[in-house]
Amino acid sequence: MKAAPVPQPLLTFGQCLKQLLTKRKLSASALSRMMEQKSRNSIFRVLDDTSGPAAQTAFYESLIASDCLSLTQEEKDALSRSLEVSRVGAAGYRSNQAMHRLLGDVDIKPQSDVPFRVDRSSDGSRTTFEEAMQRMARENRSVRFVMTGCCYRSIFKTIAEAFTPEQSCKISILHYMYTGGDDIIRFVSAIQPVFYSPDYEGYCIRENEFNNEREQIYRANTMIVHCVRINGEKVSYLVSLIDPRRMLLIDPCNENYVALLEKMMHEDQPRMHRMKAAIALDYIHGDYLAYTEAFRKLERGRAIYDIKLDVPISYIHPDLLLSSVRKGFSEQEFGEGAEREELIGKFYDIHLRRYENFMTKRRATHTIFSREAMMEFAKTGVQSDHFFAMAPYEKQERVQILAHLRDQHCQNPYFNLYFFKPEYHPPRTEICLYEGKGTMLTKADTDFNLNGSHTETLVSQSEFCQKFKEFFVKDLLDSKVLSAEETTAVFDELIEAAKSSEA
């Protein structure tokens, strides 16, 4: 098996530029002359990383415009990346990249040619983690993981892909994570493949919560794996990650040691912080009312930082929902006769209160949309997360919805709308911070069927919420969204698209 690639250090802009000059055997003075700079002092400040982000950005743009070094695309990308490292630091850069991965903007590079190697202690045989998980899923009735650390996306992706519903092997994951510094963002991104599952339970351990010896246990990358064979036989394994892509599987493991370790972890749980809290309810009509009411309470009076593909239903006056709701409820047989009208009336009351909260509260709402998804809504009347029991919005309703959002964007200082820049990939995860309560992660492009593919989870871990807000304000709003004037122009374009649509 191939060795895992050695990660390259993150360079500041000055360091990256020095590297390029060394590669081309150029001096700083020579580059300054090639760029026709009036003062050579500025380039030395850039190289020493003492000139500040704005000056470095201006220098980078001037360098690209002059094309005096004939930079390759790879070199341009490296310089662009180093600008971000200089702006937010190496830890902040990693944190932002993890958040982009969470949104689905930055894909993890495939590492299929460097598989996780698993060495078995019993016979010295070798396999891959992927093969080991697939075999476990085939040969067992149930598998229970108790994990510390192991926060690598490839590990959880492999587990999620092996234990599919088709395998009929019940799985559960109890996960303990040490979450100091910026680790929390990377960890949530890493566990995303299993994060929404009700069978995943995560606990965060804050810095200095335990003594050094106890802390080392939670910092270790280990798995205790309890298997129940199809014939009822029980067996347990202990797995340790001993290299970046190499695991040691101890079989059979010492059952007494494992039992004592799990008992200790269970007793420590009150001093930990639960990673998530789900609010989804079982699918019956009454539960949808409770579900909607839960969101109303979550939104009420809070500052909100939201990443959505297109317009949320809570931004639409319920008068504009009635036609779509009545038609859809009838087609889907969502309630009957008088019961249906009573249900619609209750939904109307809750949504009116939600709508009025967003339009009148004196705490800011910030929402970033995907232009592509909003254009699809303008043309078809179908939201990316359109409720399965609602019909599409009619043309005139769409025009009114979009015109109202445009007016709020221009006139309401507490209601701030944005669009991602064209070069930013549309997110595949919707994330919303309800300040003071938690951050909601929602799978995009579902039909809100709580008995189907729709799922969300509320992360109440305070460090994650703080880091997401910093990312939203200092990264997304600073460099990834259109200006206010450009946003208004996009709304004008959307309104015209709705007016001229055939549907």
Named regions from a protein language model:
Residues 1-28, 33:
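A short, Lys/Arg-rich alpha-helix, primarily the initiator
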Residues 1-10, 55-115:
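Short amphipathic recognition helices of helix-turn-helix/homeodomain-type DNA-binding modules
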Residues 21, 46-47, 59:
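DNA major-groove recognition helix of helix-turn-helix
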Residues 32-34, 58, 142-147:
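Short coil/turn segments at secondary-structure boundaries
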Residues 36-55, 81-82:
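Recognition helix of helix-turn-helix/homeodomain-like DNA-binding domains
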Residues 120-481, 489:
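Hydrophobic protein-protein interaction segments
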Residues 481-503:
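Long, C-terminal catalytic modules of enzymes
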